[in-house]
Each structure stands twice: as C-alpha cells, then as structure tokens.
Amino acid sequence: MGFKCGIVGLPNVGKSTLFNALTKSSIPAENFPFCTIEPNVGKVPLPDNRLKKLNDIVNSKKIIPASLDLVDIAGLVKGASQGEGLGNAFLSNIREMNALAHVVRCFEDENITHVDGSIDPVRDAEIINLELIMSDLETVSKRILKCEKLLKTNDKKNKAEHEILIKIKNDLDQGKLINIEGFNEDERTIIKNFQLLSSKPTFYIANISDDGSSDDALNKLIEFANISGNTVIPTSIKIEQEIAILDEEERKEYLELMDMDEPVLNKIIFKGYELLGLQTYFTAGPQEIRAWTIKNNSTAPNAAGVIHTDFERGFIKAEVISFEDYISCNGESGSKEKGKLRLEGKEYIVKDGDVIHFKFNV
C-alpha cells in the first residue's frame, strides 16, 4: 500500500547501520557526514508469530508476511531549512513519509565523529525538530497570505483553512511540533493537505552503548520525549546489526544468552507499523497464507481492495473468522461447525487478525 517510515537524524548517528540491520542490506555506513545522499528504500517483513500458527493448521505451500517500507534519509544539519547541508533535498524526502523513526546518538566513541563534537541527545533531537518547524513556518506563512487575499470572498472553506493555519502558526512560533490529535476530524483532513513535516507521527530510537555508559544520556532523551508523548526505543544498533546477520539457530541461541525474547529491531518495526495506523488481516489456503496490510478502521470492501481493485468493486460479502477462533477451532471447517464463521457485509470494520475469504462479482 506504500506506507513509508523514514529514518531521520543528524549525520553519523547510526541511521544507515539501522537500515542495513532492518532490511538485511549492505548500503555504505561510513564515519563521515552525508555518507547517504539519495534515500535508500527497503521492504521489511513484519515479524508475526500468528503466521506460523495458521500454517501449523493449513500446511500451506507459501507464507507471505506483511511488510513495511523503510527509507534511510540523508542526515540533517542545523540550518537545513535554509538549505544548509543537504537540507532542501532532506526536507523534501521527509515530506513523502507517513511516519518518522528519529535516531539519536547516546553513546561516546572517540573513533566515531559527531557533527557538533559532543554527545547531547536532547540538543540533537531539538536540532532536527527545529528544522522541521522552521520549514513548516515558511509553508504555513505563505499559505496564510494566500488565504488572506481570499477572505473578502467569504468562502467558508477558505475561512476554515485560515483559522486552522493561524492556530498552527501560533504553535510553530512557540517552537512546538504539530500534534494532529489536538484537532477534530474535519481539521485533520485539511491539515493533511498541508503536508507539514512537524506533524508526522514520530518515535525516537536511542542508539546506546552495550556497557551501560549511555544511561545518563538515555534518561535525558526519555525525559525530553515524554514532554511530547513520544516513545523512545533504546538499542545498540551495532549489536542489532550483528544479530541480524546470524542464521535463525544462532540468533535464537544469542537471544537466549542475552535473556531477550526477540531482537529490538522487531519492536522498531512494530512501532513504525503502529504509528502508521496499520493492522493486519489474513487469507489462508493450501496455496498460500498471507498477511495483508490495511489502515485501522478499514471496511471489508476496503480490505478486499488491497488484494485487487476488482475485489472491492464487486464486493458481495466476507466470510470472517477471528484469529483466536480459527486457532481454537483448528481451522475453517472447525470454525464453521462451531458457528464461529460470520458473514459480513460492506459496513463491517475489519479487526486485526481476522482470517477472511471474500465473495465478489465483477
């Protein structure tokens, strides 16, 4: 469906290394600023244990997980909104993202340069945020001038847009990121048309050392993120990359040794999925079991359209079994026998984990 999560941050904080670990790629990750110029794009499979449980029952020939598009974006520097560094290109790339994973360096290492010469995660996070705010201020100010020229026409749509823009500008002037949750549904629809950088759903990835020496810096970043209600996921990106290249058996042994249930990378992928407002439904048959990605609160026809537009256009009904019922009843036949298979129409809101078979006619 093309939902994109951008990896952003200052140069040399671990963005490209994280991208490599998540996508199992080998793009350059060098010890100098702007190693990444053009954004790198990769698909990341969503780890989902439910697929294995479904396959234990169905024994399908193929298993296809859901995926997330990750984009490694060039490092930002102070003054990017005025064109410094790769500023204009960087900001343009961010505008295309649906959510942001903001990597912040929290570890000391004299062998890895820092663009500002010292480790200060709050300062670094604020640099990125300020550049997004400054870019949005320019966008909003131009839009306000355009609206003001039309105010005399008493156009209701223009007036509503002007009022929202003034509200947004006041927040930006105070150095605040735009929290779209603070607006009603109609206002959000208008705001989305502005493509504001500072309104992108964001979480922080704290790149820490593996010896506990990053604790102070990490705590400062968490305290800073809590103010705006953002999540911080701490991890040693270097170690995560080492885990990512292990085969399945070696990875399992390593995680057991480290007393970890799963790689932290999985949490990062799920957080991106969550921020994008996505969920999964399944189709299951002898040829393939597949996880499909849809927006939260999608109707059954919307969900069918992800498979093929004909499915949505000619939608008749959906045969739905919840994941829990499918497993407890040992598949479709058992679910039918126990009355757990439901016929749903066009108004049905698909739930995460639903196992669905669509009926359509075109």
Question: Which residues fall in each region the model found?
Answer:
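C-terminal-of-GTPase-core extension/linker across diverse P-loop GTPases
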Residues: 2-8, 13, 19, 146-349, ...
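Conserved G1/Walker A P-loop phosphate-binding module
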Residues: 1-113, 122, 141, 147
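Short, flexible surface segments
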Residues: 96, 351-352
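Flexible beta-alpha connector loops of hexameric P-loop NTPases
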Residues: 76-81, 117-119, 123-132, 151-157, ...
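Switch/coupling subdomain of P-loop NTPase systems
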Residues: 95, 99-100, 107-135, 139-142, ...
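Amphipathic, soluble alpha-helical interaction motifs
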Residues: 57, 100-103, 131, 143, ...
